[in-house]
């Protein structure tokens, strides 16, 4: 297993339900060990070793103090660790399976953060996988649990189930038709949170949004997933309607925009992250509307991931200034799009 190589995790490589709109689903369970101080206050490396002993050879342990800054950044870009773990977790670690659809962060804000990712809208599959791992760990270690409040966590907003269910969606139709603001307001009024592609602290960009639950206390895991799934089904429907409207009423203008973006990425020699992200979003929309039969969703995911700064530094084999990064990004994008 070499997680630092430029390859897609299984949840970005494989097909999933409603994946014309939904990029991925994720379930994250926050857990702490009984009689151990929460890692946000006091990190202990032996806690990592004790937890890691529970898992078999199907998981690879990666300790943060044994890898480079570049390798940490690669893990963040692949959504396998959080920006918090990259920047603040001295004695943190992550357990990964071969498919990279299970990521168990150790000594992040909590002792364990069990993440299971699936392609498309498959929250229940992710929940089943996460609860299976959680049950296995709970048979061998004692969690910090209160009969009244549920699982105890470093952040009070996670107390209860300790669960965050989230869905990453691409909503260019709603953005272009200027309906996204009202949709986000409706989502928030139902008790859900809308963030950017890297979750907490990140802003939505290039029509990619992450929608997650806010309430963890007073509802079961199944109820939370059912509620979020229902919300996402409504969002998916509205996004498809918006795309159909754009194609029917503004076909030439939309086609021009999409093919201009394609021409830009096929021929550019210097390109910024933001410009590339916006163009990739346009092309992804074009793929879903049938403008590009030779471009797969998998290739679109490659464009998104491998044009990120850390992957570009790995491609170049060195640190780069801003101009060099833009040049390498343009080269990588041309190579991916040109590989039919």
Swiss-Prot record:
The keyword Nucleotide-binding applies. It comes from the Bacteria. The keyword Cytoplasm does not apply. GO terms for molecular function: ATP binding; creatine kinase activity; protein kinase activity. The lineage of its organism: Bacteria, Bacillati, Bacillota, Bacilli, Bacillales. This is Protein-arginine kinase. Residues 21-242 form the Phosphagen kinase C-terminal domain. ATP binds at residues 24-28, 79, 113, 164-168, 195-200. Signal peptide: none annotated. It catalyses: L-arginyl-[protein] + ATP = N(omega)-phospho-L-arginyl-[protein] + ADP + H(+). One of its GO terms (biological process) is phosphocreatine biosynthetic process. Catalyzes the specific phosphorylation of arginine residues in proteins. Keywords: ATP-binding, Kinase, Nucleotide-binding, Transferase. Its EC number is 2.7.14.1. Belongs to the ATP:guanido phosphotransferase family. One of its GO terms (cellular component) is extracellular space. InterPro entries: Arg_Kinase, ATP-guanido_PTrfase, ATP-guanido_PTrfase_cat, Gln_synth/guanido_kin_cat_dom. It holds the Pfam family ATP-gua_Ptrans.
């Amino acid at each position: 297993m070499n997680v630092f190589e430029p390859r897609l995790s299984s949840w970005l490589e494989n097909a999933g339900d409603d994946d014309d709109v939904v990029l991925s689903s994720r379930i994250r369970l926050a857990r702490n060990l009984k009689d151990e101080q929460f890692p946000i206050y006091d990190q202990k490396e032996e806690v990592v070793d004790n937890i890691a002993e529970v898992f078999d050879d199907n998981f690879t342990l990666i300790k943060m103090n044994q890898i480079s800054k570049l390798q940490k950044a690669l893990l963040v870009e692949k959504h396998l660790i959080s920006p918090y773990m990259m920047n603040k977790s001295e004695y943190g670690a992550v357990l990964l399976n071969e498919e990279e659809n299970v990521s168990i962060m150790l000594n992040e804000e909590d002792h364990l953060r069990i993440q299971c990712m699936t392609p498309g809208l498959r929250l229940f599959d992710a929940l089943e996988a996460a609860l299976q791992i959680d049950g296995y760990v709970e048979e061998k270690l004692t969690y910090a649990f209160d009969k009244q409040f549920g699982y105890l966590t470093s952040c009070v907003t996670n107390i209860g189930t300790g669960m965050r269910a989230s869905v990453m969606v691409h909503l260019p139709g709603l953005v272009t038709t200027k309906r996204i603001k009202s949709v986000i307001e409706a989502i928030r009024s139902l008790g859900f949170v809308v963030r950017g592609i890297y979750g907490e602290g990140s802003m939505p960009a290039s029509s990619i949004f992450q929608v997650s639950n806010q309430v963890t206390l007073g509802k079961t895991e199944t109820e939370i997933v059912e509620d979020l799934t229902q919300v996402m089904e409504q969002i998916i429907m509205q996004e498809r309607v918006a795309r159909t409207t754009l194609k029917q009423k503004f076909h030439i203008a939309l086609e021009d925009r999409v093919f201009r973006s394609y021409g830009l990425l096929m021929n550019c020699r210097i390109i910024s992250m933001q410009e590339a992200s916006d163009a990739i979003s346009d092309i992804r929309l074009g793929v879903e509307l049938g403008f590009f039969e030779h471009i797969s969703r998998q290739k679109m995911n490659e464009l998104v991931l491998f044009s990120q700064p850390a992957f570009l530094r790995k491609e170049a084999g060195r640190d780069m200034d801003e101009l060099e990064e833009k040049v390498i990004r343009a080269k990588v994008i041309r190579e991916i799009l040109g590989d039919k």
